[in-house]
Design a protein with these regions (language model features):
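Short amphipathic alpha-helical interface segments
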Residues: 1-22, 62-64, 68
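Generic leucine side-chain signal with a strong bias for well-ordered alpha-helical environments
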Residues: 9-13, 31, 57
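A short, conserved structural fragment
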Residues: 33-42
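Minor-groove-contacting beta-hairpin "wing" of winged helix-turn-helix DNA-binding domains
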Residues: 44-49
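Short, amphipathic alpha-helical interaction segments positioned at domain boundaries
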Residues: 51-69
């Protein structure tokens, strides 16, 4: 899966899109395989449940903000 697709899916998760009804269900499940989870709290925070997921989530968030600037 490309970084571009991962970042798009991450952005959609950040804005609360329902992952169960998403057209890229397989890709989102792939992200979940890395341990990505969404925490439903006021801060819209993310967590990763595996070591690889933590590293990948950190990398994607950094990459996402680089593209914003």
């Amino acid at each position: 899966m490309s970084d571009e697709l991962k970042m798009r899916l991450l952005k959609e998760l950040m804005f609360g899109k329902d992952v169960c009804d998403h057209e890229h269900h397989e890709e989102i499940m792939f992200l979940h395989d890395f341990g990505f989870v969404k925490l439903y709290d006021d801060n819209m925070q993310f967590a990763a449940t595996t070591e690889h997921g933590i590293e990948e989530l950190s990398r994607l968030i950094k990459l996402y903000f680089v593209f914003l600037n």
